[in-house]
Amino acid sequence: MDDNPTAVKLDQGGNQAPQGRGRRCLPKALGYITGDMKEFANWLKDKPQALQFVDWVLRGISQVVFVSNPISGILILVGLLVQNPWCALNGCVGTVVSTLTALLLSQDRSAITAGLQGYNATLVGILMAIYSDKGNYFWWLLFPVSAMSMTCPVFSSALNSVLSKWDLPVFTLPFNMALSMYLSATGHYNPFFPSTLITPVTSVPNVTWPDLSALQLLKSLPVGVGQIYGCDNPWTGGIFLGAILLSSPLMCLHAAIGSLLGIIAGLSLSAPFEDIYAGLWGFNSSLACIAIGGTFMALTWQTHLLALACALFTAYLGASMSHVMAVVGLPSGTWPFCLATLLFLLLTTKNPNIYKMPISKVTYPEENRIFYLQSRKRTVQGPL
């Protein structure tokens, strides 16, 4: 026979090699833009300072949802522009001013480059614009936004010096402190910077269960994620979920689950449907679910269940704090998320599967789990 089987195999292998290389190149390329984009950060180290600063600002915008990824920051910025360009502008101004202030105060450079000195001011700028009673494009508002953004690195540094003793993050406590201070100092009747009037509930809400809309409930899931940035547009919430997904699929999953649990909590307390549809029950629980479900605790099925419990607890705490703080005319912000999640992180247990990540090692859930498994392996092999 003239046929050479060996030659045929070699020929087939030669034709398949480029396809195999293509399949290998795709995951490698995705590796450069997913996670925390560490390779990109290393590449920027010898580049112009202005380019590095843009990277820090974009990471700061995305750090609100525990993501340190400039591309995710761009996507989130796009989502903010879809929602309201004025809010997006205030958020950017806050992030830039806060990052510059941290540089002037000689704060930890690694925290600045990771965006950890910008994210609180992102929320400060956005929420100050939302609660302003002057409406959009009241340009004088940029002055108090800049002033309050300058306080964020101060609050962060002070809180970190205390919380670091327990190896705890500051979360969005600086944002809550800055926003509460500003709104309580100005109020609804301030002649220069009036804020939206917030009043406690004084009557029984009209909740008619047959009017409950399944479509609106479905929309409220991405809206709950969007409300982390004060956005009530479902498309914006979807963009935010995409930005989180780019960095970490596990974070995206927990963000969606947390928002869903917030909806369930709202329905269980017969909350006004308008509040549930607007995502007001979902954003704190979404943040809590992300934080416990793999970010500040290594992801196991035990910590996954703990994240679900924390999300529900946060939603109910949010309802409680909203009623209490409305008495003094203030929003609850992300106080419920901060307090509930810090409480869960202080949990002590002898279960090795509930592993709290050292703050210095926290990145994103997939990488955190690898660190946890390696640490556990070293612990097992240590005595040998």
From Swiss-Prot:
Residues 1-22 are annotated as: Disordered. The record marks 334 as: Important for channel permeability. The chain crosses the membrane at residues 61-81, 85-105, 111-131, 138-158, 237-257, 279-299, 305-325, 327-347. Mediates the transport of urea driven by a concentration gradient across the cell membrane. Mediates the transport of urea across the cell membranes of erythrocytes and the renal inner medullary collecting duct which is critical to the urinary concentrating mechanism. Facilitates water transport in erythrocytes. One of its GO terms (biological process) is urea transmembrane transport. InterPro entries: Ammonium/urea_transptr (IPR029020), Urea_transporter (IPR004937). It is found in: Cell membrane; Basolateral cell membrane. It is a multi-pass membrane protein. It holds the Pfam family UT. Keywords: Cell membrane, Glycoprotein, Membrane, Transmembrane, Transmembrane helix, Transport. It comes from Bos taurus. Belongs to the urea transporter family. This is Urea transporter 1. One of its GO terms (molecular function) is urea channel activity. The keyword Protein transport does not apply. PANTHER family: UREA TRANSPORTER, UREA TRANSPORTER 1. One of its GO terms (cellular component) is basolateral plasma membrane. Homotrimer; each subunit contains a pore through which urea permeates. Identified in a complex with STOM. The rate of urea conduction is increased by hypotonic stress. Glycans are attached at residue 206.
